[in-house]
Swiss-Prot record:
Residues 1-55, 563-649 are cytoplasmic. GO terms for biological process: cellular response to acidic pH; cellular response to aldosterone; cellular response to vasopressin; intracellular sodium ion homeostasis; multicellular organismal-level water homeostasis; regulation of blood pressure; sensory perception of salty taste; sensory perception of sour taste. It holds the Pfam family ASC. It comes from the Eukaryota. GO terms for molecular function: ligand-gated sodium channel activity; monoatomic ion channel activity; WW domain binding. Belongs to the amiloride-sensitive sodium channel (TC 1.A.6) family. SCNN1G subfamily. Its main location: membrane. This is Epithelial sodium channel subunit gamma. The chain crosses the membrane at residues 56-76, 542-562. It catalyses: Na(+)(in) = Na(+)(out). Changing residue 197 to K: In a patient with bronchiectasis.
Amino acid sequence: MAPGEKIKAKIKKNLPVTGPQAPTIKELMRWYCLNTNTHGCRRIVVSRGRLRRLLWIGFTLTAVALILWQCALLVFSFYTVSVSIKVHFRKLDFPAVTICNINPYKYSTVRHLLADLEQETREALKSLYGFPESRKRREAESWNSVSEGKQPRFSHRIPLLIFDQDEKGKARDFFTGRKRKVGGSIIHKASNVMHIESKQVVGFQLCSNDTSDCATYTFSSGINAIQEWYKLHYMNIMAQVPLEKKINMSYSAEELLVTCFFDGVSCDARNFTLFHHPMHGNCYTFNNRENETILSTSMGGSEYGLQVILYINEEEYNPFLVSSTGAKVIIHRQDEYPFVEDVGTEIETAMVTSIGMHLTESFKLSEPYSQCTEDGSDVPIRNIYNAAYSLQICLHSCFQTKMVEKCGCAQYSQPLPPAANYCNYQQHPNWMYCYYQLHRAFVQEELGCQSVCKEACSFKEWTLTTSLAQWPSVVSEKWLLPVLTWDQGRQVNKKLNKTDLAKLLIFYKDLNQRSIMESPANSIEMLLSNFGGQLGLWMSCSVVCVIEIIEVFFIDFFSIIARRQWQKAKEWWAWKQAPPCPEAPRSPQGQDNPALDIDDDLPTFNSALHLPPALGTQVPGTPPPKYNTLRLERAFSNQLTDTQMLDEL
């Protein structure tokens, strides 16, 4: 064997070998754990203590198991070639449909309550436009006989006035023709009726109890002014009528509904639920929540929805309260209050109205992502409607509550709060002035309702597409109207004509439901994923690395600091408890030594002779070391001599 190979073999025999050439598996594993980039294996080896080592073994094995599981799923999904097909037919719940006649009460049943008001209204129209007293001479004579000998009490309470733009601060009374001074604020309301430009405007004046604070409301159209004036008195009169009596004065379900079909199956008045609205009378809701089951449909199209024929009965319309004929329909959820006056769709007579629906569901995230509310429990406004929370319900409830607080009574067109009454002249003489002032503050967002009320986080909305067609046709009119008259029987005492009827179709255009759902842009999973990506990209860190950092910098670091502080505390306590040691006498040192006490100026030769001798310094008690003992003995001198002698031999 060559000398170099012998030396290498001897080194391998005597020195431990690590790394891939380690002689044992244990040494190989130890080398791998100390030099690998996988943090868990290294922490198993370098960790001190059995508990920490077991924890790191558990973390590492768990991470390995998760990696194997996820990789197995990826491999299985990659090599899977089978497909699955799911075919299912879904049904959509049909919404609740509320139908109201535009005319709230039959004119023949409320005429005796409104006789004086209507007579003064006709007089005002005659004074302003030369309007005839009535459509029929006989009716005019009967109204005149009723009001004969009576003073106009409605115009006396709220006078109708004509304002001339040339005369500021003055107005002419409708009935007396006298001019009067008008003070206070003047509020002009825009007209929705076309009119000829004129220098005169029509309005009325509302004052508080002491008549010192007044507000004048003017309209560019006399028709709007008279209708608004009539509506105020109408609400005051009807607020004093009991609810049961008002239900009897309005239309019954048998009178309003002539025919009914849903999803191709016949239905009748028993499938509708009564809902009394203060301004629209008796309304009827189809597929209400009071039904045992909510109806649904599995097909789209007009043949699979709701089809009804409505009897409008135009002759029973109040000529001053409403100026159009037809019905109103609103589509809503089963637990939602139908705001007919806000979002109702009008149905024309002698026409078929087709309404195609498309459902959209919206789901919003609550705080901190938005200011919506789940059920209204976090809104400090009491819900006076017997329905689920919505933004409209909150706004109307807030206004009605403010009305009761400031005016002492409730507005007629909204539900009553607990322990409140509707406004009327007898108990609340100035409620109209208070109502108008409060409504103006509400529109200008001065009551705080808009800032308190929140939107609902989840709601359903039906997008409507409306189309019209003439109904019945000229050809079918000859046989259809007699048949419908016969079907009505005793409900109708006359032959029906096309202007008394309206047909309504409500259906889903298709069964495609659109859902709008909000999701947080940065969820906790996304946050952890982004953190992991940044740590892995820039520092090659993993979850195990993060745990290692937590162990070193948050556990070991603070434990070392705590241990040092504890050691210092123990030393301080031991020093505190130890008896005090006697102090050794101080030897004069430094400037305390009198021998070093010199003047600021350098001494001269003569002055140095007079200085006192220096005090003897203390001699140290320990003798100086013997340096001879530090000399090195040549222990191998004899051995070296022997070696030299052997060489000489």
